[in-house]
């Protein structure tokens, strides 16, 4: 299994879902959405490999922080490497018991039809899905 690569972690953020969240940004994306806020994440080898040591540190940081409401997985596209994502999600849910948000360029419907990606949905509480689109945004 190809290892996940982490671009960045934000131990406390209010920008990646409701409440205070621990955000993990993963590398790898094939969508290449126009207006992407993180094009440096498209390469699957950007950042650093997610080692057991790094993952253990992340789990400990999450469990040691009483103000966290949950975990957010973003990127890139977390579903770029679905088998490694599944292992990560399973470990985070089992060891932290936090709710998990995941941002992806895939639609929910396409993930349901994809046998390699669908199992990840069992460990995601909130899915923010679909490609980035700025056609419906207006400044007020």
Give residue ranges: language-model regions.
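Short, cysteine/histidine-rich loop/knuckle motifs that typically chelate Zn2+
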Residues: 35
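Short glycine- and Lys/Arg-enriched binding-loop motifs that mark or flank ligand-binding interfaces
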Residues: 13-15, 71-72, 126
